């Protein structure tokens, strides 16, 4: 049993290392981002990614990457995370419309329509309080920042605000807009 566990750990480590080598480290872009927004760049090691941590609205927002092994391949994602004081217990997920979300809708998956046609047609919004989501997403600046992301999965669950997108994001203006998005969301959620 112990040798099998060691083998699994070694295989996961190899997958992570290969993924980092294939996708490249975002260090140069992330150092620039940290400098531009007054954040801290923390260099990664062999088995952990580099990260950027910024204080946004008195919360620590962390940018990093993670890799999910599956079968003989793996997928790498860029993510941002922050704790949030979620007094109302609101939970939601916002993602771009795609084939799977359209199939889900056809099979009865709920999509919260906020009443703004271009946003409603481009995004799948799910959550536990439709009125709160409509109020939150009525904010033009918030919608603009969400719409500026070509790939997005933004969620609030419990006390964590979370963004993820496939691949390693090295585009500094896009990363800045993600930190701005978190700032606007933290303002609205903790008001």
Where are these regions (language model features)?
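Charged, low-complexity intrinsically disordered regions
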Residues: 29-59, 67-191
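N-terminal signal-anchor transmembrane alpha helix of single-pass membrane proteins
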Residues: 1-33
């Amino acid at each position: 049993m112990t040798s099998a566990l060691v083998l699994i750990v070694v295989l996961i480590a190899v997958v992570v290392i290969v993924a980092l080598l294939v996708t490249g480290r975002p260090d140069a872009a992330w150092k620039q981002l940290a400098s531009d927004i007054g954040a801290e760049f923390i260099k990664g090691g062999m088995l952990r990614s580099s990260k950027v941590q910024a204080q946004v609205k008195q919360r620590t927002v962390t940018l990093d990457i993670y890799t999910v092994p599956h079968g003989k391949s793996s997928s790498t994602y860029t993510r941002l995370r922050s704790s949030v004081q979620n007094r109302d217990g609101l939970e939601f997920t916002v993602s771009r419309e795609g084939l799977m979300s359209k199939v889900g809708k056809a099979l009865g998956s709920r999509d919260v329509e906020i009443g703004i046609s271009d946003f409603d047609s481009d995004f799948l919004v799910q959550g536990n309080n439709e009125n709160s989501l409509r109020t939150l997403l009525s904010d033009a600046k918030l919608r603009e920042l969400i719409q500026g992301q070509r790939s997005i999965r933004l969620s609030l669950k419990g006390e964590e605000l979370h963004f993820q997108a496939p691949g390693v994001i090295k585009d500094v203006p896009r990363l800045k807009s993600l930190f701005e998005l978190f700032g606007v969301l933290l303002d609205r959620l903790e008001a």
